[in-house]
Amino acid sequence: MAKAPVRARKRVRKQVSDGVAHVHASFNNTIVTITDRQGNALGWATAGGSGFRGSRKSTPFAAQVAAERCAEAVKDYGIKNLEVMVKGPGPGRESTIRALNAAGFRITNITDVTPIPHNGCRPPKKRRV
């Protein structure tokens, strides 16, 4: 007896007008995640996942490409306004914000959420090259 054909349900994209872009800029890579106001991830991209490897991952251009790819991934949600949360000291901090602005989003707020210890863990020793 043949099974009845299974219909694939078309996933309905919810419409979100305001979003939050979380930018994690480390010295080695840049991760861009766009969420709704509640923190549910809508799309993400990384410099490494955008085709950059090794030391090219940690460039401002790689961060810009990652931000463009992330913006492309969430454009179906209808986001118009973005709040940007930047974390980390990496080279991709500024270029991601510029790329998100150029992608057509209206940036309403930029917040630096880099964690700063109140004299917590001992930092790693200095590099000797």
From Swiss-Prot:
- Name the InterPro entries on file: Ribosomal_uS11 (IPR001971), Ribosomal_uS11_bac-type (IPR019981), Ribosomal_uS11_CS (IPR018102), Ribosomal_uS11_sf (IPR036967)
Q: Name one GO biological process term.
A: translation
Matching SUPFAM superfamilies: Translational machinery components (SSF53137)
**Keywords, comma-separated and alphabetical:** Ribonucleoprotein, Ribosomal protein, RNA-binding, rRNA-binding
| Listed Pfam families | Ribosomal_S11
Q: Name one GO cellular component term.
A: ribonucleoprotein complex
GO MF terms, alphabetically ordered: rRNA binding; structural constituent of ribosome
Biological role stated in the UniProt entry: Located on the platform of the 30S subunit, it bridges several disparate RNA helices of the 16S rRNA. Forms part of the Shine-Dalgarno cleft in the 70S ribosome.
- What quaternary structure, including any partners, is listed in this protein's UniProt entry? Part of the 30S ribosomal subunit. Interacts with proteins S7 and S18. Binds to IF-3.
Hey, which family's this protein in?
Belongs to the universal ribosomal protein uS11 family.
Protein name as annotated: Small ribosomal subunit protein uS11
Species annotation = Erwinia tasmaniensis (strain DSM 17950 / CFBP 7177 / CIP 109463 / NCPPB 4357 / Et1/99)
